[in-house]
Amino acid sequence: VTPLELLALICFFAVIRVAMSIKPMPVAAGESGSPSARTVIREYLDAFIVAGLVALFLITFVVRTFFIPSGSMIPTLQIHDVLLVNEFEYRFIKPAHQDVVVFMPPIPTPNDFIKRLIGAPGDTLRIHNGIVYRNGVALDEPYIAEKPNYEMEIRDYNVYVDGQPLDPAVANIPPKSMWTSPNTIPPGCYFMMGDNRNDSEDSHIWGFAQASGTFAAGPDKGQAASFTGHAFLIFWPLDRLHILR
């Protein structure tokens, strides 16, 4: 349900509620001690309108739903899962390691991506035999689908802040450097990976991400992208209802 659809539904029930208040229904003799059907209906409508307004506020300013269209995050997220995404959190705190993040990628697409945050600014990453090492420590990753069968290679990229390229001395890692050797993530950048490592288009293809609203993208991409929010709950289907870790 979009905010506009929810608002239309609230307005519809509000009109019914107002109409029921214009001309009270007569109470039959001997029934003055019990609430009329009209009164009961009005109370239910009041409750629905209040709940709808609260929901409208939440989905407009705090959370949104996100539908999983692909298998890049299997087994954590299955195709057709529906998630709740906190759009409010990253306005005040930085994204954390292992967060499952929704964002617009720096490629020509109208669709959001969803990946896991593996590396943050200042982290040194190395990938060897399918194992990710962050600051010299092998990551415990029980969430991945299977051991990756490739060594990751970063694409050429430039980092843009407020539409201006960052100083190359700060922003650039040597072109197409292999992540089998340690590489330090530049300031303001994040390394995103899908849990289904062998079937995920992520940072090893299109570069780094920034929560501030820009991405470090390859020169052939030419589009900035931004974090939308932190995915925190699978709420559909009901048999998969749980908080994301």
For each predicted feature, which ranges?
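Soluble "head" domains of membrane/secretory-pathway proteins
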Residues: T2-I41, F66-F67, P75-R245
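Transmembrane alpha-helices and immediately adjacent membrane-cytoplasm interface residues
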Residues: R38-F67
